[in-house]
UniProtKB/Swiss-Prot annotation:
PANTHER family: MEMBRANE PROTEIN INSERTION EFFICIENCY FACTOR-RELATED. GO terms for cellular component: plasma membrane. The keyword Transmembrane does not apply. It comes from Nitrosomonas europaea (strain ATCC 19718 / CIP 103999 / KCTC 2705 / NBRC 14298). It is found in: Cell inner membrane. It is a peripheral membrane protein. Belongs to the UPF0161 family. This is Putative membrane protein insertion efficiency factor. Keywords: Cell inner membrane, Cell membrane, Membrane. Could be involved in insertion of integral membrane proteins into the membrane. Pfam families: YidD. InterPro entries: Membr_insert_effic_factor_YidD. The keyword Cell membrane applies.
């Protein structure tokens, strides 16, 4: 299951992600963050961390450097 989600993230990055202008306010980008979180923490915690990050990525958040804990 974890590998399926990682593959979907890669599919997003190399297809849809190339069609829309970059707008992530953080470094690493939200898709990279989700990938790193899944690899480092596993499926449940990785998804939780990634979703929290995506919800913080909006115009009213300053963004900046935000590594995977």
């Amino acid at each position: 299951m974890k590998q399926l989600i990682i593959d979907l993230i890669k599919l997003y990055r190399y297809s849809i992600g190339l069609l829309i202008p970059p707008s992530c306010r953080f470094y690493p980008t939200c898709s990279n963050y989700m990938h790193e979180a899944l690899v480092k923490h596993g499926l449940i915690k990785g998804l939780w961390l990634g979703m929290k990050r995506i919800l913080r990525c909006h115009p009213w958040n300053q963004g900046g450097y935000d590594p995977v804990p």
